[in-house]
Design a protein with these regions (language model features):
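N-terminal leader/capping segments at the start of a protein or of a new domain
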Residues: 1-71
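Short, conserved beta-strand element in jelly-roll/cupin
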Residues: 98-118
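Double-stranded beta-helix
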Residues: 146-188
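Conserved short histidine dyad/triad with adjacent acidic residue
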Residues: 76-100
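Conserved metal-binding segment of the jelly-roll/cupin
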Residues: 127-147
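Short, solvent-exposed loop/turn segments at secondary-structure junctions
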Residues: 86, 114-116, 123
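Structural signal for conserved beta-strand scaffold positions within catalytic alpha/beta enzyme cores
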Residues: 6, 38, 75-78, 155
Length: 188
């Protein structure tokens, strides 16, 4: 189940908010300009499903998001138990960074955690199957797919280069709980 845990950016051991209530998650994220919504997954895909098959299954939703955000490129990121070099893939996203465009993801399967540092707080957002998150351009954040990563997500881009990070050089990400914390004990 999706989860939002909010910390002061100077207190990674003391949550200010910890909830699994969808309405509360969406409202709290909306307050910082982050879109969070839930779509119904229409089908489970085999690990070898083509990008075309997955995008065809969500064609209406993909078109709506592209039209609303002006996204020109859409692809699928898929990490399975058979993906080689998972530690390096995970490490690529773990340092705080920004993007010059929105970072939009719809989770088809599996889970990942976005950490959004906004207004002196870190919002740790566990996204799971059926979750759409849109992180606005220039928002400082990082992402953890976990040590045993398994996920598939539709990604939306304004540019053809795809995912282009601008690393902040901050070490803040290493101070906050990792993926296993987010998927651990249920929120209070």
């Amino acid at each position: 189940m999706s989860r939002l845990t909010v910390f002061a950016d100077t207190a990674p051991d003391t949550p200010l908010l910890d909830t699994q209530d969808y309405s509360e998650i969406a409202a709290t994220l909306n307050d910082i300009g982050v879109r969070f919504e839930r779509w119904e997954a229409r089908e489970a895909f085999p690990s070898d499903a083509s990008q075309e098959d997955v995008l065809a299954a969500y064609a209406d939703e993909v078109k709506r998001i592209c039209d609303e955000g002006g996204y020109a490129t859409v692809d699928i990121i898929r990490v399975t138990e058979d993906t080689p070099n998972k530690p390096a893939i995970r490490a690529k996203f773990l340092d705080e960074h920004t993007h010059s465009e929105d970072e939009v993801r719809f989770f088809i399967e599996g889970a990942g955690v976005f950490y959004l540092r906004v207004e002196g707080k870190v919002h740790m957002v566990l996204c799971e199957q059926n979750d759409l998150i849109s992180v606005p351009a220039n928002t400082t954040h990082w992402f953890d797919m976990g040590p045993d990563a398994r996920l598939a997500a539709i990604r939306f881009f304004n540019n053809e280069e795809g995912w282009v990070p601008n690393f902040t050089g901050s070490g803040i990400a290493s101070k906050f709980p990792e993926f296993d914390y987010a998927v651990g004990a249920p929120a209070a």
